[in-house]
Every structure is written in structure tokens, then in C-alpha cells.
From Swiss-Prot:
Name of the protein described by the UniProt record: Glycerol-1-phosphate dehydrogenase [NAD(P)+]
Species per Swiss-Prot/TrEMBL record: Methanococcus maripaludis (strain C7 / ATCC BAA-1331)
Function: Catalyzes the NAD(P)H-dependent reduction of dihydroxyacetonephosphate (DHAP or glycerone phosphate) to glycerol 1-phosphate (G1P). The G1P thus generated is used as the glycerophosphate backbone of phospholipids in the cellular membranes of Archaea.
Predominant location category: cytoplasm
SUPFAM superfamilies for the chain: Dehydroquinate synthase-like
PANTHER family, per the entry: GLYCEROL DEHYDROGENASE (PTHR43616), GLYCEROL DEHYDROGENASE 1 (PTHR43616:SF5)
Binding site for NAD(+): 77-81, 99-102, 108
Enzyme class: oxidoreductase
Domain of life: Archaea
Protein localization: Cytoplasm
Pathway this chain belongs to: Membrane lipid metabolism; glycerophospholipid metabolism
Cofactor binding remark: Binds 1 zinc ion per subunit.
Binding site for substrate: 104, 147, 229
Gene Ontology molecular-function annotations: glycerol-1-phosphate dehydrogenase (NAD+) activity; glycerol-1-phosphate dehydrogenase (NADP+) activity; metal ion binding
Amino acid sequence: MIVIPRYTIIKEKASIRIPEILDNLNLKNPLVITGKNTQKYNKDFDFIYYDEIETSDLENLKNYTKDYDSVIGIGGGRPIDIGKLIAHKSKKPFLSVPTTASNDGIASPIVSLTQPSYMTEAPIAIIADTEIIKKSPKKLLSAGMGDIVSNITAVLDWELGKIEKLEKYSDSSGIFSKTIAIELMDYVLNSDLEEYPKKLVKALIGSGISIAIAHSSRPASGSEHLFSHALDNMKEKYGIDTNSLHGEQCGVGTLAIAQIYLEEGKIEVETVEMIKNSLKAVDAPVTAKQLGFDEEILSEALSSAHSLRNRHTILRNGLSKEKAREILEKSEII
């Protein structure tokens, strides 16, 4: 059964409507999962700081909610993911209250605390207070753009999986995911960005819903996400000190993967330029230097990305380091 949010509120001061939404859902006693910086947005309910929760013992998570009828996640990616996971394990409704907009986890059924990611259920409600989100660091909002443009290459990979591996494919989810990305890119390239935080939140929620429709991360996660995970591995392997975010890495990964599709004649050069210019418009990184990695690290990440998950993508059986470097040079990432 497809589960998508019953309530989606995206407006200034939306957070004051949390009690109303709970009442509409006949929920009386939620447990809030939040952080020390975002607890100030929780004025009414019992709470636990997300960094005090041990998530490795999955079966024990349901014990947190034995005295509660629902779970609310308030904050960025981690408190929302942990709240989602606790709600899933305890079979209770989850409400998402994002305080920033850096990835589509605010609305998707996916929990990305570990790799591979974990499938749960989409939030029953999403309450996005744009007054709060506008105040979040610009770097986080730029990362959100990277997560959205990655839908373009993710859907291309999904279509490739359908053709070459006879994978199940949802036309409605694929079209929805691509349209969301194109509409946001069109907005940032043709406006003064005054409404960017609100438009971004809408796009991220739509992206999350496309995942819920497909019951798979396929419409929003492809080879560009594998590249991002490979970069995370490089950080750990070589002790690289960079504060690059998931969405930023996915944005740069999208440029690299789009170059491969361009060479195979499966994407228009205008679309590739649109992706790059959209990232630039919101000051998201488009080069290795802006991400904080040297050229060799990016080449290694791109050449190893295919091995991180059993998922068919344009990377197929992998690129040599030489070919990876060529792709990165042609896309002007290095």
C-alpha cells in the first residue's frame, strides 16, 4: 500500500498548527525527537535529543514510544530520520517538522542513517515553517538544490535499469520526479530567489512523495548518490577534513553523471547546462575545489561508486580512473 502524507503545510508560522494537525489525526500524546538547537521549536510535548538515542539496536527503538501515540521529528536530517525509524519500529504515525531543507528525507519513507538506506513509511504529516527554514544556513539550502537536480540523472538510471535489466519502473513516479527538478531549476534561473526556500521545500517534499509512490529510492537516487557515498568513504579512508554536505556532493555527482549520459546521447546539452547554472544560481558547488576535495580523490570516488550498491546505473561495471578523470575534466569539475 502506498502511504503519502495526509497533511502538508508549507507557510510562515506553520509550526503553530502542530496541535491542530495532531487533533485532526486524533493524536494526543506525541514524543518529539529533536536537537539541542531545535528544541526551542517544541513548546508543548515530551522530547528526547536525537544524539542520546542508540539507533544500532533497532528492536529496542519501539520502547521509546510505549507511553506515546505518535512521533514528531523536529530539526534537520538526523532527528527526522531517527524519528521516522522509531515510528516505524513502534508502528506509530510520524510527523515531520523540518527546520531546514537540505534533502528530501523530510518527506520520503527512506531512512539514511546507514548504507544501504532503510525503507520505512512516509510521514503522515509534514509541517514546514518557512519563517524558520529561511533562517537556516545558506549552505544547507544550497545543498537542497543539489539533492533535487540529482532526480534528473536518477530517473535516467532508473529508465536504464528498466531497459537493460527489466527492472520495475513507475512512469508516474519517474515523470513526477523529473518535473519537480525541472520546475525548481526553471524557477532559480528566472527569478530573484525571494521565494527559493519555499519552492525548495515544496520540491523536496514532492521528491520524497515520488519515492513513496515507487516504494523505492530509484526516482531520486542513482549513480550520483553512489558517487556521494563514495566521497563519504574517501573522507573516512584518507581522513579528509571537508564539510561538504550530501546534497552538495550529489549536485556535483549529477554533473559528472550527466556528462556520461551526454556522451551516450541520452540527455540534451541544454539540460546539462541548466543543471550546472541552477547549482551556481544558489551558490552550490560545481567543482572539486569548491567541494573541498582534490582531483585524484574525485577520480577514485567516481571509479569506485558502482561497487557500493547492487543497483544498475549508467556506471554499469565501473569506470577506469582514467575514464573517470576524463569525465570530470569534460564536465569542468576538475
